[in-house]
Amino acid sequence: MVKKYKVIDNFISKEALSGILLLFVTLFAIIVANSNFGDFYFNLWDKPLGVAIGDFIISMPLRLWINDGLMALFFLMVSLEIKRELLIGELASVSRAMFPFVASLGGMIVPASIYIALNPDNFIGFGIPMGTDTAFAIAMLILLGKRVNTALKLFLVALAVIDDLGAIIVVATVYTSELKLEYFLHAAFVYGLIWLLNYFDVKKLSFYLFLGIFLWIFIHETGVHATIAGVLLAFAIPISSRMNEKKFIEKTKADLEEFERCMDDKPILNHRQINALEGIAYGYDRVQNPLIRLEHDLHGFSAFFIMPIFAFSNAGVLLDFSTVWTNWMIVLGVALGLLVGKPLGIFGFTYAATKLNIIKKPKNISWFEIISVGFIAGIGFTMSIFIANLAFIDEDTISAIKIGIFTASFMATVIGMILISINYKFKISKA
């Protein structure tokens, strides 16, 4: 239990720092896009880059290498988190998972419904207000400090994990071009090989990652969004380690005793001590769960490299509000979906399901706090931008949507933080 909460604490702290970094990167991108360097900024991401393997060539603009390539690693990390939560985390128990599941369901259905109601002719953008930027949302809760209890943070993490799963399903099923059967068969063959590794209990991550590269290539060529390769790979990564904890402790103790026995007066280690250290390193490598190890390695890389790069390349928008008026119904649908749909859906679905005795509300979270977190979940930002780039092609439309996303996310942040602060003061006054 202690180990589980330590994993969650590490997750929350990294996400919080990443969220603050993303805020600065986003502001910098907007400043650059509207400065004298604006043309250079926009042209940079359209520069073509190609990779050739024999006669096979993949050539894409730099922005797509980020959105399809680096973001595949991000979705790999997210899917590893989802798998961990489903197997050993907050979502492992059906009773505990039901409340955030219903909340997330409402937080996706209501925003999408609001968007579709306002944009029946442009319904393809319904996925944009469904997203929650986990890093930003958690960062806002961390900034509130002791005003947010641990249970509320865990609820937001569970909500965000299920939300990410919903986003993955939408990307895989809705924002996919015409399928090419030939490459689909290639991808299926490679994925079959990956599962063979899992079946034969292969724990070496390098084998999975090597085949994962080919899986990404073939899925990219099928017409399915290439980030789905990261999702598929994650669910094939084994969770069990090559050495159990008890055996690791016994072996490490034996190696440490050997190291101590072989100590001498010389200032350098002798061969037997080096062998003992290698034995400890061997045990250290084998006791780690492949899934947890890969998630840990990717988390920092994703939080402090992939997402800032994605934000910098995609958040830059010309503050030309004429594009907003041209696309005002789409912008309104996105903004209201995030600002109104998220809190309304999260609160409404959980409240109704609780009254119908379908789920039980956690005792240490109030309904007022659920509404507050509903607004915080309305911070769509990077996930909403990512889906906007898939849903629309016209640059002016995407720019207008970005302005709507920024505005709604900012307002949702302010309202959510104010409500949580009011709730804290009310609790203090009653104490």
Curated annotation (Swiss-Prot):
Pfam family, one: Na_H_antiport_1
Membrane topology according to the record: Multi-pass membrane protein
GO molecular function per UniProt: sodium:proton antiporter activity
Transmembrane annotation, as ranges: 17-37, 56-76, 98-118, 123-143, 154-174, 182-202, 209-229, 301-321, 329-349, 373-393, 400-420
Subcellular location: Cell inner membrane
Record GO biological process: regulation of pH
Signal sequence residues: none
Catalysed reaction, written as an equation: Na(+)(in) + 2 H(+)(out) = Na(+)(out) + 2 H(+)(in)
Keywords of the record: Antiport, Cell inner membrane, Cell membrane, Ion transport, Membrane, Sodium, Sodium transport, Transmembrane, Transmembrane helix, Transport
One of the record's GO cellular component terms: plasma membrane
Stated role: Na(+)/H(+) antiporter that extrudes sodium in exchange for external protons.
Family to which the UniProt record says this protein belongs: Belongs to the NhaA Na(+)/H(+) (TC 2.A.33) antiporter family.
The protein, known as: Na(+)/H(+) antiporter NhaA 1
Taxonomic lineage: Bacteria, Pseudomonadati, Campylobacterota, Epsilonproteobacteria, Campylobacterales
